[in-house]
UniProtKB/Swiss-Prot annotation:
Its main location: nucleus. 2-oxoglutarate binds at residues 137, 139, 149, 214, 226, 230, 232. The gene is Alkbh2. It catalyses: a methylated nucleobase within DNA + 2-oxoglutarate + O2 = a nucleobase within DNA + formaldehyde + succinate + CO2; an N(1)-methyl-2'-deoxyadenosine in double-stranded DNA + 2-oxoglutarate + O2 = a 2'-deoxyadenosine in double-stranded DNA + formaldehyde + succinate + CO2 + H(+); an N(1)-methyl-2'-deoxyadenosine in single-stranded DNA + 2-oxoglutarate + O2 = a 2'-deoxyadenosine in single-stranded DNA + formaldehyde + succinate + CO2 + H(+); an N(3)-methyl-2'-deoxycytidine in double-stranded DNA + 2-oxoglutarate + O2 = a 2'-deoxycytidine in double-stranded DNA + formaldehyde + succinate + CO2 + H(+). A motif (PCNA-binding) lies at residues 3-7. Its EC number is 1.14.11.33. InterPro entries: AlkB-like, AlkB-like_sf, ALKBH2, Oxoglu/Fe-dep_dioxygenase_dom. Activated by magnesium ions. Residues 11-32 are annotated as: Disordered. This is DNA oxidative demethylase ALKBH2. Keywords: Dioxygenase, DNA damage, DNA repair, Iron, Magnesium, Metal-binding, Nucleus, Oxidoreductase.
Length: 239
C-alpha cells in the first residue's frame, strides 16, 4: 500500500481550492506550526497549512494579478533532445546576479514582487531558512501537470531545502524512489503520495532530491487553477 501524509476532505478532491481545517501557523502560533513529518528511506519532508483560507485567497488573487509568466521560447522544455510546450505556465523571480538552468533553459529571475516577498518572508520566519529565488508554476486545471523529476540542479546551494507553497486547487503530489522507476526497477520501494492543500507549505529537506523523484500528475476531475511557489537557495553566478 502507498504511504499517505494528508487526507483532505471531499471538497479538496474536487479541486475547489479549499484546504482542510488549518493545522499550522495560520490559526495558531506562527513560529510553532503544527508540522506533519514524512519520513522514508532517503526522504525527509515536513508539511503544514501555513496560511488560513482568507489570507490564502488574497495571496492567490495577488499572484494572478502580479506574476508575469514566460512566453515564446521560454515556454518550452527540452526532453531527450526535443523541445516541447510546457504543460503549465512558469516564471522565475529572485535576487539580482542569479541564474538558474533546468530543462535546457538558463533563466535570469525577474526582481521580486511584493506578494512573492511576503510569502517568502513568512516561510523564512517559520523555517529559519533563507531563500533567494522562486520558481512559479501555474496549473490552469487538472490537465496541466509536471512529470517525474528531481530538483538537483548544480546552482542549488548544497544542503539547502526546497520550500513548496501551494495556492488554489488541491492536487496530488507523488514521490517515487529512483530505484523503483521504469519497467524493470532495481527493487520495489513504496510510492509516497500526499495532497497539497490551499495555503500549504511542504519542505523538501536533503537528501530527498538525491533519492526521490516527484511529480504532479494529470487529474482531469480538477477544474480549478493552482499556483505553486518553490523557494530555493541559489549560488551566485560565477563571473
Amino acid at each position: 500500500m502507498d504511504k499517505f501524509l494528508v487526507r483532505p476532505d471531499l471538497r479538496d478532491l474536487q479541486g475547489g481550492g479549499e484546504e482542510p481545517a488549518p493545522t499550522g501557523g495560520a490559526s495558531g502560533d506562527l513560529k510553532s506550526p503544527d508540522w506533519r513529518h514524512l519520513r522514508a528511506e532517503g526522504l525527509s519532508c515536513d508539511y503544514t497549512v501555513l496560511f488560513g483560507k482568507a489570507e490564502a485567497d488574497k495571496i492567490f488573487r495577488e499572484l494572478e494579478q502580479e506574476v508575469e509568466y514566460f512566453t515564446g521560447a521560454l515556454a518550452k522544455v527540452q526532453v531527450f533532445g526535443k523541445w516541447h510546450s510546457v504543460p503549465r505556465k512558469q516564471a522565475t523571480y529572485g535576487d539580482a546576479g542569479l541564474t538558474y538552468t533546468f530543462s535546457g533553459l538558463t533563466l535570469t529571475p525577474k526582481p521580486w514582487v511584493p506578494v512573492l516577498e511576503r510569502v517568502r518572508d513568512r516561510v523564512c520566519e517559520v523555517t529559519g531558512q533563507t531563500f533567494n529565488f522562486v520558481l512559479v508554476n501555474r496549473y490552469k486545471d487538472g490537465c496541466d501537470h509536471i512529470g517525474e523529476h528531481r530538483d538537483d540542479e548544480r546552482e542549488l546551494a548544497p544542503g539547502s531545502p526546497i520550500a513548496s507553497v501551494s495556492f488554489g486547487a488541491c492536487r496530488d503530489f507523488i514521490f517515487r524512489h529512483k530505484d523503483s522507476r521504469g519497467k524493470r526497477p532495481r527493487r520495489t520501494v513504496e510510492v509516497v503520495r500526499l495532497q497539497l492543500a490551499h495555503g500549504s507549505l511542504l519542505m523538501m529537506n536533503p537528501p530527498t532530491n538525491t533519492h526521490w523523484y516527484h511529480s504532479l500528475p494529470i487529474r482531469k476531475r480538477v477544474l480549478a487553477p493552482r499556483v505553486n511557489l518553490t523557494f530555493r537557495k541559489i549560488l551566485p553566478t560565477k563571473k
